[in-house]
Structure formats: C-alpha cells, structure tokens
Amino acid sequence: SSTSSDSSSSDDFSGRFSLDPDDGASLQYVPGAASIPEIEKLKNLHPTTGFVLRTEDGQEVGGPKERSSYDDVVAAFGQPVSSTDSANPGDGVNVWATDNGDIMAFFRNNVLTDITFRLRGGDANHQSTGSISKSDTPKTALERLGKPYAIMRSENGTSYVYKDSNGDESSFSTQGNKIFNVTSAAETKQLKKITGLDKNQ
C-alpha cells in the first residue's frame, strides 16, 4: 500500500511552514461560526510556545509577541470546571464546559500555549480529510467537510480534526489562509501508535 507523499517530499521547509504566529484567520470559515461565540473568542486568543528569539540587547525579534494569560482565557470563557492544579491554574491544564462544546487549555507560567475546542455535535459529522489537499484553501476545505470534531490552536497553526464513521481521526492544519499540512486517518493511527497515545494497540 502506498502512503501519501504529499506531506513530506518535494516542497522545501520554508514553503510548508513559517515561524510567524498564526492569526486564526481560517476560523471564520467553520460552518455555523457566526452562531458559535466560542469561535470568535478562540480567534482573539494568542497561544504562544514561550519560545522567543531575542537580539543581543534582549529585544524580542519581530517585536514583542502577543500572549494570552490564564486571566484572559477566564475572561473569555468563565471559570474552568476542572484544573490539573487548582491552586495554580496558570500552570497546567484547565477544562471549560460551554454551551457549544468543551474547551481544554494548556498553560505554562501563566501563558496560554495550546487550546482545543471540541464542538458539540462535531462527532456526528462523519468525515475524513481524504478529499482535501494543501492546494485547497481553508475555506474550501471547511465548506466541503463541514463541522469539525475539534479545533486546536497553537502558536504556529490552527488545526481541524474530523472523526469518520469508524471513529478514526484525521486533520488538516492552517496558517493564515493556507493549509500547510493534511494528516490522513492512517497517518494519525500510525502517529498514535508511535507516541503510545493509542491504548488499543
């Protein structure tokens, strides 16, 4: 069986990926986004790795990076329903329950590093990313696939996860208005096996 070489060979590193923070522009194309206020709030947050390039005099390269604190996320979504460290919620993982789904956010030193929004009803839309490629726009891909099972934001990209009728996950990742990665269900399974995330193996 041949695997898709779409995600690796030929295109050079710079074409696939830049170090610019992703602005979450593709979020506006999520079907029904206008009636899901959490999506606009997600777009206004600034996850960051905390990795900062500095010049010799200590200035941040490209100007100070925008960040979102634990308090910013609380301002957006209210108090979390659970925290890995309730005494110090700005370090660790916090979970919010909202009208339109669940949110899980990771923090380090009070700075938001990653945030995942699992959309209510998204698991009923049995789709996979097999029909899209990096030459599609995020708008086309989201129109074709419909409501995602989950949306993940990190500093360098916004990812959309789908679950097919077998419960297998696949995803695509966007930066600005480009798709820079498509991961099939088979590749996702392989990754889970390698990283030990798949407990069924």
What are these regions (language model features)?
Residues L119-S135:
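A low-complexity, Ser/Thr/Gly/Pro-enriched, surface-exposed linker/loop concept
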Residues F13-T49, L53-E60, S68-V111, S133-K134, ...:
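A cross-family detector of function-defining hotspots
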Residues S1-D11:
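Acidic, proline-/serine-/threonine-rich low-complexity intrinsically disordered repeat tracts
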Residues I115-F117:
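A short acidic-to-branched-hydrophobic micro-motif
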